């Protein structure tokens, strides 16, 4: 998405697709906000550009559209809809494949990128998927209460401090969703409640 016009067309395609499939807009907006915070916090490690951040935001808005087809396998259904739906025709083709892959990988066991993708594109898929998984887990109950207050590099891993939500009851889910991010960072990802 190098040109302003294609970015506007992509935003419009995402908005239309989100509406068409009845996506929870408040959840999508909140997950996008959390994902952008994580994107910024981990930017020294992933070194991805502005285009990747836009794809991440779009994935946050579209990650649950597969529920329109079925709850079971909604990540796969969502990826298919993004790759094939006419509403997405104006989305840049290469970024559309990346977007579809990120949505596919937001839950369950992630799929690797196609071998013919350049290394940078494969890395983008891994990082964007990992960040979306954590952001979505932080708003799993669709309450829009979690706020990332700080991300700290500490003791060979990272501590994500969360306000508005006590992460302890969700420890297993958060650890499961942070597995990809931990692999990319080379250390554990820990969640704790931010001090008030």
What are these regions (language model features)?
Residues 132, 138-191:
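Low-complexity, glycine/alanine/valine/leucine- and proline-rich hydrophobic stretches
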Residues 11-16, 157-161:
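A short, surface-exposed helix-loop junction/capping segment
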Residues 2-11, 53, 151-154:
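Flexible hinge/switch segments at interdomain interfaces of large molecular machines
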């Amino acid at each position: 998405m190098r040109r302003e016009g294609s970015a506007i067309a992509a935003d419009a395609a995402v908005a239309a697709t989100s509406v068409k499939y009845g996506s929870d807009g408040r959840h999508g907006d909140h997950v996008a906000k959390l994902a952008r915070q994580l994107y910024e916090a981990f930017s020294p490690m992933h070194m991805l550009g502005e285009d990747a951040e836009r794809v991440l935001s779009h994935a946050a808005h579209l990650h649950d559209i597969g529920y329109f087809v079925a709850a079971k396998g909604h990540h796969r259904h969502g990826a298919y809809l993004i790759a094939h739906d006419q509403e997405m025709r104006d989305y840049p083709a290469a970024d559309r494949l990346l977007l579809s892959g990120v949505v596919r990988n937001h839950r369950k066991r992630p799929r690797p990128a196609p071998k013919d993708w350049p290394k940078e594109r494969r890395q983008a898929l891994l990082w964007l998927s990992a960040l979306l998984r954590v952001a979505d887990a932080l708003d799993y109950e669709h309450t829009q209460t979690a706020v990332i207050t700080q991300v700290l590099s500490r003791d060979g891993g990272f501590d994500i401090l969360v306000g508005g939500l006590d992460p302890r009851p969700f420890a297993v889910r958060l650890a499961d969703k942070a597995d990809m991010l931990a692999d990319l960072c080379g250390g554990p990802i820990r969640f704790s409640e931010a001090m008030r």
